[in-house]
Regions:
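Positively charged n-region of N-terminal signal peptides that target proteins for export
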Residues: 2-10
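Gly/Gly-Pro-rich "capping" loops immediately C-terminal to redox-active cysteine motifs
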Residues: 43-75, 79-87
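Flexible coil segments in periplasmic/lumen-exposed cytochrome c-class electron-transfer proteins
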Residues: 83-86, 90-132
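Ligand/cofactor pocket segment of small-molecule handling proteins
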Residues: 24-50
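Electrostatic cytochrome c docking/interface patches
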Residues: 16-29, 45, 59, 130-131
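Stable alpha-helical elements in mature extracytoplasmic
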Residues: 26, 30, 63, 67, ...
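The canonical Cys-X-X-Cys-His
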Residues: 30-40, 71, 82, 96-99
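Cleavable N-terminal signal peptides
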Residues: 10-11, 21
Length: 132
């Protein structure tokens, strides 16, 4: 079965949304890795920030790279240290970013596992990750 046209671009995104992560879906992965600090809807849980200000980052190449680096290597912020999640699979990290993209109703293309893979192996420290 070959897909052409718009369906060819939409299919990877749809597959990521339905991707079983640890057998329970991306919502379970979000709850386990992100929601404890950033909230179920990315609204923030004191003292940790909401993620609404990240929405514009999804629309630029520099912003998208920054989001991937934060998930892989962590980030040092005013509220403390966010851990990196490099132990997760590329598909899982892409699914988390796509979940955030949907939560924020941000503009931008869905992330693919390849977007994560190309940033692995840099061994960056959290304080080296700078917002563009």
């Amino acid at each position: 079965l070959a897909y052409t046209g718009p369906m060819r671009r939409l299919l990877p995104f749809l597959l990521l949304l339905g991707l079983p992560v640890w057998g329970q879906g991306v919502e379970a992965l979000w709850a386990k890795t992100c929601a404890q600090c950033h909230g179920e809807k990315a609204q923030g849980v004191r003292p940790y920030p909401g993620l609404g200000e990240a929405a514009p980052l999804f629309a630029t190449p520099e912003g998208r790279r920054y989001l991937v680096l934060v998930l892989l290597y962590g980030k040092k912020g005013a509220s403390g240290l966010m851990p990196g999640f490099a132990q997760l699979k590329d598909e899982e990290l892409a699914a988390l970013l796509n979940h955030l993209l949907a939560l924020l109703k941000a503009k931008g293309e869905p992330f693919k596992p390849e977007d994560i893979k190309k940033e692995r192996g840099q061994n960056l420290a959290p304080d080296q990750i700078k917002r563009p």
